[in-house]
């Protein structure tokens, strides 16, 4: 029915109603933690020196939940994506073969089980929580004489409160002329020895001109030293947040060339320094908040890597990295 009458008029003897209050202004932000959780088990590395690492993509996919299943899958010669489900506990070092992706489901873990990547290539370790690997079984992740390795969204730790510094070994060591390695979005915490690049002062013949490593968007917390420690290598560190480093932060030695950008140190002794070697290394430091600590190293010559990357800016690093780094992905 079509209404054709006159429009209703507000009576002149009534006061006009007050206008409604304005709607609150809402600024919507994209939550980086939500975005960071979107992932696929076939993702390839797209950041840093390890870019292009594809792991087991294109091979078989297998889900493992026991030490025996995990060891068999990781050591095989076949290209494979290995999905870790649940908690796996042991006291061993598992040798990881080439063309593997080791992917942790949310809530999965390796306790007492270290990963050993030696003379291999094209390996991805992603969303893995690894802890309490005894020194006799090596590092949480040990990379030797290998190339194209991507460690992403991992949680690496130990039990620092109850044991001395040599009860466990390092959390993540990259040695023996390894090349094209990226460590990204990883939570490195509660340990004495964080991450070592280059294992010995006497290994210059093998390591010089090698050890190209990128550390991007990592959170370092309550680690005494090696955050990281670098001999001989060329290492790019950007968008990292480090706190409670009781002995030292970044240690550059034996001629290492470091580029440190868009990063923050908090409650740290000797943020960028030189310790425990015959000769110093070098560091170019851009937009780094030392948090009242010091950078006492000479400036080097490494000013730009041969890949593109995005700097968050030191003022934005903490909000972007804390709570996002670590085992935070779902697949």
Curated annotation (Swiss-Prot):
GO biological process, one term: pectin catabolic process
Pathway: Glycan metabolism; pectin degradation; 2-dehydro-3-deoxy-D-gluconate from pectin: step 2/5
Record has Glycoprotein as a keyword: yes
Gene3D superfamilies in the cross-refs: Single-stranded right-handed beta-helix, Pectin lyase-like
Protein name: Pectate lyase B
Sequence positions that bind Ca(2+): 139, 169, 173
The protein's role, per its UniProt record: Acts as a virulence factor active in plant tissue maceration.
PANTHER family hit by this protein: PECTATE LYASE 18-RELATED (PTHR31683), PECTATE LYASE 21-RELATED (PTHR31683:SF18)
Keywords: Calcium, Glycoprotein, Lyase, Metal-binding, Secreted, Signal, Virulence
GO cellular component: extracellular region
Cofactor(s) the record lists: Ca(2+)
Subcellular location, principal: secreted
Cofactor detail note: Binds 1 Ca(2+) ion per subunit.
E.C. number: 4.2.2.2
UniProt similarity note: Belongs to the polysaccharide lyase 1 family.
Catalytic residues (positions): 226
Catalyzed reactions: Eliminative cleavage of (1->4)-alpha-D-galacturonan to give oligosaccharides with 4-deoxy-alpha-D-galact-4-enuronosyl groups at their non-reducing ends
Pfam families tied to this protein: Pectate_lyase_4
Cysteine disulfide partners in this protein: none
Class of the enzyme per the UniProt entry, highest EC level: lyase
Glycosylation sites: 99
